[in-house]
Every structure is written in C-alpha cells, then in structure tokens.
C-alpha cells in the first residue's frame, strides 16, 4: 500500500504535514479503507496510528470515527465525529452521529442531534441516511408509527432506484414488519432487492465509479417480475441523477 492508494481529496488534506509524515499517514488511511469491511479492528488500529501523527486533520478524525463505529465503540465514534465536525465544518456524518447516540443508549439525544440540522442543506444521500437513522431512534423508543413517518421523505420513490434506495426501502420494510403489516413489508423488501440488483448490474458494467456519484435507475415492471426470491434482476435502464456526496444507519 502506498500513499497513492488514498483518494485525492483525502491526500489534499494532508498537504499541511511534512512530506514523510503525510506519506505515513496516507498509508495508514489507505489501509484503514482497504480493511474496514474484512478486518474492522485492524482498520481501526491503522486509523488510530494516523491520528497519533495527524490528529488535527479532519479526514483522519473522520476515519477514526467511522472505524470506531464499525467495531462498536460508539462513545469514541461520537467524540471523534464531534471533533471532525468542528474541524471540517461539515454535517456529512450527521447520520453516523445519530446512530452513535443510539449506540450509547440515548435515542432521545439522537433525535435532538438529528433535528438540530437543517436537512435542506444536506446532500441527498446524507438526508436519506439521516431519515433512516432517525427512524431507528424512534424504534428504540417504541414509537413505531413515528418511525414510519420519519421515512416518508421525497426520496422514497418505489419506481426508481438511486444508490440510497435499497437501504431506504429495506428500512421501511423493517418498520412495516414491526407494525405487523407483513404484506406491505414483503413488498418493500422486494423493492429493496430489485433496486440492489439493478444497481449492482450497473456497477458491474462501469469500469470506474466515483464514490460520491449518485445513480438513478428506472425500476420497470419487468425488472420487478424477473427478480423472484431466488433469481436476479435482468432488466434496468440507467439514467443520471442529481449530484450528491457520499456518508450508516
């Protein structure tokens, strides 16, 4: 792994460091990104190593927060997310903050954190992630009807698939199941599966895909019929959607 394996925007944040230090920190961050799915604990160790050498860099604190969240250290994730927010001035990890408050057993506080943000200023994908996290906090409080209301957002379009659609559809399915509306829950879970398969097909056809690219795919009737519980979606028409930035519920 070399410093070049780290994405460009993150490398740019390291320019205030000495050349040798920037190289070392970049390698740790690149390793954290590479390992987070397969070995989150080791990814977290690399993030902590980067933090020891570059604790005032926003992307470093963000990486510590994300890896801490992944291993279930929600208290550390919260501290690091607050620091990241203060350094960067960004709210793009607000959904993770809400979920981390849930993780430490404070769903009421999670709702306060989510409500304090002007959602109209957020990128679309972040807005969707926040809605999912807020819905989860409502479930934690036993407010199932209000959990469903949190997901009633303009982005909930059953006929089109964006990059955020599978998670949003699946979240709605889970809440409907909690409400005992099993038939509706199954329909939304099916839509989630169709959307995920369609997006997966498009990704497979693309040589490269920017991490912050938002893709829109029309979900036609044939695609939904083709995706039986044991089959794969075969038909989807890909279109471009509005730009957005990439952030978990």
List where the protein language model places each region:
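Solenoid-like repeat scaffolds
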Residues: 14-20, 48-55, 82-89, 116-124, ...
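Generic helix N-cap/helix-start motif at coil->alpha-helix transitions
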Residues: 21-27, 43, 54-61, 88-96, ...
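Structural register within alpha-helical repeat arrays
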Residues: 31, 63-64, 97, 134, ...
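Structural motif corresponding to the intra-repeat A-B loop/turn of tetratricopeptide repeats
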Residues: 36-38, 71, 104, 141, ...
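TPR/TPR-like (Sel1-like) alpha-helical repeat modules
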Residues: 87-90, 119-120, 144-157, 169-170, ...
